[in-house]
Amino acid sequence: SSPLVLLLCPLLTVLCAPLPWETMPDEELAKSYLKSFYNFREDNGSAVRRALSPLSQKLSEMQRFFGLEITGTLDPATLEVMRKPRCGVPDGKISAFSIFGDNLKWQKKNLTYRIENYSPDMSQAEVDQSIEMALQVWAGVTPLRFSRVFSGTADIMVSFGRQSHGDLYPFDGPQGTLAHAFAPAPGIGGDAHFDEDELFTFRSEEGYVLFLVAAHEFGHSLGLSHSSDPGALMFPIYTHSNPDSFVLPQDDVRGIQSLYGPNPEGPLGPGPEPPTTPDACDSKLVLDAVTTLRGEIYFFKGRFLWRRHTQSSIPQQSLIANFWPGAPDEIDAAVERRSSDRVFLFKDRQVWAFRGYDLVAGYPKSISSFGLPGAVKKVDAALLDEESGKMLFFVDRMLYSYDEATETLEPGFPQRVDRTFPDILGRVTAAFEYRGFAYIYSGPVMFEYSLGSKRLFRLLDNSYFLTCTRF
């Protein structure tokens, strides 16, 4: 659905609702997606895989927005993004925060909202609280104030509907488009519609948290378009997070304040700083962890990871929660065990194990399951030498070696890191094994060792694998 276009092209008509995205053939999905979100218009002579076709150009535009490798073809990474649940508003220019333009903002500070109907998925009190909390996300950083009305027409009309629901943009059934909203304007402008074929929840990790979906949609109601910053609330793809600890990211704060200015009352008290998105082009970047997974490389920092695909030199950035909903943020270490197709994520005294996207039953567990003593409060880095079956843990300036076969720590460990890996004198911050080499990070510097001989080959910087992709 394309609510912004409705404001500009009121004569547009829609003949039928699209098929659910998860059952749609790849090429049909691509065309439908690009029509909905990138203004693609069908050209009878265009094939989805032909270079320089109108479709290829729109694929490139979509790939650039999401930070994918720009191939202009329907590759697996592009399809994976297309199948993720998202907002129904089209994606705009490729930038951090973005506004609709043409001064599409409210010319007053006091706005009204009305909840026209309710979702049967939640109690009315839970819907009321979710909507109020979502509006307060924006009121907290601007002069805008919201008051609820129970009859008549409000500035922001909130409703739940399925398929054709009274505007020109029918919903598409479960998954796919979750909701859409209209930019500030008279009439339908500012209104937010939620797809009743989705499962909306108050706090559960099942379904979609209404507060998070609504907070995003109200950004549109106030004049923001989509951001290409994967950490922003206004990023088009849905991301689960805990509503009780949600803090509006810096990108969204900058965007909304560019329209309305800051909250003249200031913050209500000391609180967390708005989170920012780490930059792969930062020469001082210190990664939290690095691991391989099924031939790809994953780099972790804060709430984020970069994923370097097998056929691409361009890493794709996303929130960890988008990839592994059950995983913690700000992990300490990560390591892949290829023999069991598992990746382990460490934080404090706990370890999580995932197979693909799924949390393995019985996890998280204590790191003592890897033989680490109670004195170890956290792991700084880990790597597995599959040849020898030894899992190496870096803790402060000490190294522990865990024998996968006997499930015990090797005799003679812990020992100083530089006894095994000469020249590493500082604290190890991340490590991984790749094609027979150990890559060990100490701050922004990376050491390349032969895993067999432990001989140092090269000193590199973070950008050797995590390439800067600033356009």
PLM region descriptions:
Residues 1-285:
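Zinc-dependent metalloendopeptidases
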Residues 262-471:
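Disulfide-stabilized extracellular ectodomains of secreted/luminal proteins, especially beta-rich
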